Regions:
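Hydrolase catalytic cores
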Residues: 226, 253-260, 287-297, 326, ...
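Residue-level detector of functionally pivotal "anchor" positions at catalytic/ligand-binding pockets or at interdomain
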Residues: 655-681
Length: 707
């Protein structure tokens, strides 16, 4: 049944992913969605549209051999890596740009979502702080970047332990619409344009006067993650809490970004200004600051969005250009490990499927196949007695027919009983292997706030001559006694993006403790296991690109860290407030959290310790350190694997390995006879008794020795 105009408008405004025609195959599907949403606003008029005013610009990656085309069509250019640019593009001009052969691709993706007292001991960061040189490190001389939401900039945790030094050096608040602070200027080979989102604040006075990020009255996440990575544990007045972060002497550069969690404070007309390309500008902002002060840098990104097969070609290319010696990005694996996320129908199998489920009103999925997909939906509703459900409609579709539709996108509205379900299908060449087909499927429960409120829906892929993989997006899978044969799902392929990217350090969560005592003396906590077992929620690989993920694990349950004292609805006097203290007339808090979001900054902080002793470490070298030093919960498994990666990080073993392999400093036993020994200051000594660094000459060679 064809959709009516009103239904089309409603459908275009869903969180769908739409594809391209041959002429617009240069666009990622999210860019295509932005254009169609913009067209819907124009077609149906402002009176029927939820948008007030113009939709504004789209922040996107553009690969082009002619930069003048971007200027011609009113684009502002914020950054470039050779012929790849990040630019704001007027939405009305995107299609026209794509008509030029010099424009090779325009890409953007949807915004992300957010995904330690004992942690420092478990992963031996405290042992690193307390060791003698060259094993000792505290993060001094290293920049930790944090891109997140909900920052309390006044928490004493950001000072040095003695409260003499405020360690946040600058912040770009992408959601700040005030006239305070300073604009952020994008720098490219062809000129400098002012970036049209947010304001930056530089220096202690400006940052403390700001007090909190623009979303600070409703969010807290970044205050917690940054505390785990680099909090000093300070409460002021000479008091140090037990909740010191992994790298307590590192300095910080912060970006407060846009996510699905804080989007309500941004005008809907500005939604396409905030994309994955905008997040790349945030990473660049942090790395540029580190470059300006000549220090190594590791960024914590405890956010992500579901992976796909076509959104991120340019994103990954640019990210690979950013990362390298002394430039590291850590990203959370995500918390979807307990969801049923994947179906595989091999050649020779006639049918595989499951029932659909979603926490929102729509469920979307992507598929990879050798041939166009044939699929089937069955809708079950109450029978006339109202006591049991029966199959009311069976809907089948062969995607070979999509070529007959405009832009190879099929939209339909199905009337099942008295309820409407909008369906959208599209197909295109697969990103990683052009010989394969990628397809997208979205179904929305138009008349209800939650998906499948009154109707159970099963899904199956068909055809013994085709190999088909189905991956979750906004929906997942479940079983149902209405058809017990449809339970072909697996709990794999749940690593979020950009954690799925090869050169990103992907962090999963382990469990060690089951309780935390709050400031009131009450005992709370979540029991996900002990002794370093993977939590059930921690994302599982492989990534859609085939990479083994995660790379490494860290504690992610019952983690106590700093939290945002400005959040109005947090009610920190309850179980989440593990400790309360007052500094300069304001109450501040330590609170409990869980998730791969909490595990990721522990790894970020440990890598900062490692960068202190070897500032040129690359992502590949860090993974080599993991391979030789991580601890293994289950020795019967081979490592790396798609559950634990290389295992749980060990800060001290890592530094020992780095010193031995990458800095040339190692600890070993020597015979002093026949050798001339000098201390680090060049003074001759008779023998080696104290711990320290020595220079030894035996007439054949000169070498460093560490005791």
């Amino acid at each position: 049944m064809p959709c009516g105009k009103l239904y089309i408008l409603l459908f275009l405004l869903l969180n769908a992913t739409l594809s391209w025609s041959q002429n617009q195959g240069k666009m990622s599907s999210y860019v295509r969605k932005a254009i169609m949403t913009n067209k819907a606003k124009s077609q149906f008029g402002a009176r029927k549209s939820p948008f007030k005013g113009d939709l504004g610009g789209l922040t996107a990656l553009v690969k082009t051999s002619d930069i003048h085309l971007l200027r011609k069509y009113g684009c502002k250019i914020y950054a470039n890596w050779d012929n790849i640019y990040i630019a704001s593009i007027p939405l009305d001009n995107v299609s026209s740009l794509c008509s030029y052969p010099a424009i090779q691709r325009i890409e953007a993706g949807r915004s992300c979502s957010i995904t330690n007292d004992n942690s420092g001991t478990i992963i031996r960061a405290r042992d690193v702080w307390n060791s003698s040189a060259p094993l000792s490190a505290t993060g001094k001389g290293v920049i930790i970047g944090v891109m997140d939401i909900g920052f309390d900039l006044t928490h004493p945790n950001w000072y040095s332990a003695d409260m003499q030094k405020y360690r946040i050096k600058q912040i770009w608040d992408m959601l700040d619409s005030s006239e305070d602070g300073e604009p952020v200027i994008g720098k490219t080979d062809t000129g400098n344009d002012t970036i049209y989102v947010g304001r930056q604040y530089i220096g202690t006075e400006a940052i403390l006067n700001k007090r909190y990020s623009a979303d600070g009255l409703t969010q807290y996440h970044g205050t917690h993650t940054m505390g785990t990575a680099t909090g000093s544990g300070a409460e002021g007045n000479g008091i140090i809490s037990p909740y010191t972060g992994m790298a307590p002497e590192a300095e910080m550069c912060v970006v407060a970004n846009y996510t699905s969690n804080n989007k309500d404070i941004v005008p809907i007309a500005d939604m396409y200004k905030y994309t994955t390309a905008t997040d790349l500008l945030g990473f660049k902002y942090i790395f540029d600051y580190a470059e300006s002060v000549g220090k190594p840098c590791v960024i914590n990104f405890s956010e992500g969005t579901y992976d796909d097969l076509n959104e991120s070609k340019l994103y990954q290319e640019v990210l690979n250009k950013m990362l390298g010696p002394g430039r590291i990005l850590c990203s959370a694996a995500g918390n979807d490990g307990a969801k049923n996320t994947y179906i595989h129908k091999a050649e020779g199998e006639s049918k595989k499927g499951a029932f659909l489920t979603s926490s929102s009103k729509d469920a979307s999925y992507i598929m990879r196949s050798k041939k166009p997909v044939k699929m089937q939906l069955s809708f079950y509703q109450n029978d006339e007695s109202g006591k049991s459900k029966v199959e009311k409609v069976k809907w089948e579709y062969d995607m070979t027919k999509l070529s007959a539709f405009p832009d190879s996108v099929m939209k339909d509205t199905l009337l099942i009983g008295n309820e409407r379900f909008a369906v959208c299908l599209c197909t295109y060449p697969e990103c990683y292997d052009k010989t394969l087909f990628a397809s997208e499927f979205l179904i929305s429960d138009v008349d209800n706030d939650t998906f499948g409120k009154n109707t159970d829906i099963s899904f199956a892929v068909l055809g013994a001559d085709n190999d088909i993989e189905v991956f979750y997006c906004t929906g997942s899978f479940k079983s149902n006694s209405l058809d017990n044969s449809l339970c072909d799902f697996q709990q794999t392929h749940s690593i979020l993006f950009p954690a799925s990217t090869q050169n990103v350090i992907t962090v999963g969560a382990t469990a060690h403790i089951t309780t935390v005592t709050s400031h009131t003396g009450a005992v709370y906590g979540d029991n996900f296991g002990t002794n370093g077992v993977k939590t059930s929620f921690s994302g599982v690989g492989p990534a859609l690109n085939g990479c083994i993920k995660p790379d490494v694990m860290a504690p992610g349950v019952n983690i106590v860290s700093s939290t945002n004292s400005y959040r109005e609805d947090l009610h920190l006097e309850d179980k989440y407030g593990s400790r309360v203290f007052e500094y300069e007339g304001r109450k501040h808090y330590w609170a409990m959290g869980k998730g791969t979001s909490m595990a990721c900054p522990a790894v970020t902080g440990v890598i900062a310790l490692w960068l202190q002793v070897c500032p040129t470490l690359t992502p590949e070298q860090i993974k080599d350190v993991f391979a030789h030093t991580c601890t293994h919960y289950d020795e019967s498994m081979s490592y790396p694997n798609n559950y634990y990666g290389w295992g749980e990080i060990d800060a001290l073993a890592g530094i020992e390995y780095i010193n031995r392999v990458y800095t040339g400093i190692e600890e070993h036993i020597i015979n002093d006879k026949g050798r001339t020994i000098y201390d680090i200051n060049g003074m001759k000594v008779n023998n080696i008794k104290r711990r320290g660094i020595y220079i030894i000459s035996d007439g054949k060679a000169v070498r460093k020795y560490v005791r």
